[in-house]
């Protein structure tokens, strides 16, 4: 074999290795192209980056928004009593309790009662709408069942029955319907869950005196709502006779003018 046809073994190995690793070729080609067109590569890289940022950009979270998400919802109602409903313990009878609700927010607020014992309890009124600063007394009725096996019911202890009071911000002029709370579930706030406590009806106590006082106020509020509103229109006298004050004054004036004219003629 001629000497000119022979090749150096080390050179042949480098060629074979270069063929087996094609990414070296791509790398060299890329580096050469980037060297030839540096401005074009810079624009393409930075242009793509700006497009991606604008596509995924989101408004930054502020401390106030994070705090609002962590803090509980602000209450709209002030309750009295605030945690428990006191009932006189009289087995076999329907007893009453009372609670005062006041709208402490700056907007009209609807409220609604719910109970875990709807068969033996009901509220009057079951719900309503309060203007800012307005108050209402609600009366809660409950039937007290006889204890099983003639066991004596422990007094001044929490019962299993609970009442939940919910609130909802509404616009002025909106009338209360229970469906309001179903249509706007995301905006409903739970004001309080009240537990039932039975107290001795024959033993004087501060809780019993306060309960009697609130029941009297609730009854007075119900009677006041039953009275018709005061009349602001024309007064009605007899059967369909409407007396307008302006017409009455005008008739008196005309009568006085006629008397004066008669006196002048005489």
Curated annotation (Swiss-Prot):
Inducing stimuli: By treatment with mannitol.
Family the UniProt entry places it in: Belongs to the VAMP-associated protein (VAP) (TC 9.B.17) family.
Sequence ranges assigned to domain MSP in this UniProt record: 76-199
Top-level taxon of origin: Eukaryota
Gene3D superfamilies, sorted: Immunoglobulins (2.60.40.10)
Region described as Disordered: spans on this chain: 28-57, 219-239
Protein name stated in the entry: Vesicle-associated protein 4-1
Regions of compositional bias (Basic and acidic residues) in chain numbering: 219-229
Annotated GO biological process: response to osmotic stress
Keywords: Coiled coil, Phosphoprotein
Task of the protein: May play a role in vesicle trafficking.
Species of origin: Arabidopsis thaliana (Mouse-ear cress)
GO CC annotations on file: endoplasmic reticulum membrane; plasma membrane; plastid
Family annotation (InterPro entries): Ig-like_fold, MSP_dom, PapD-like_sf, VAP
UniProt feature coiled coil, ranges: 200-228
Residues annotated with Phosphoserine modification: 264
One Pfam family linked to the record: Motile_Sperm
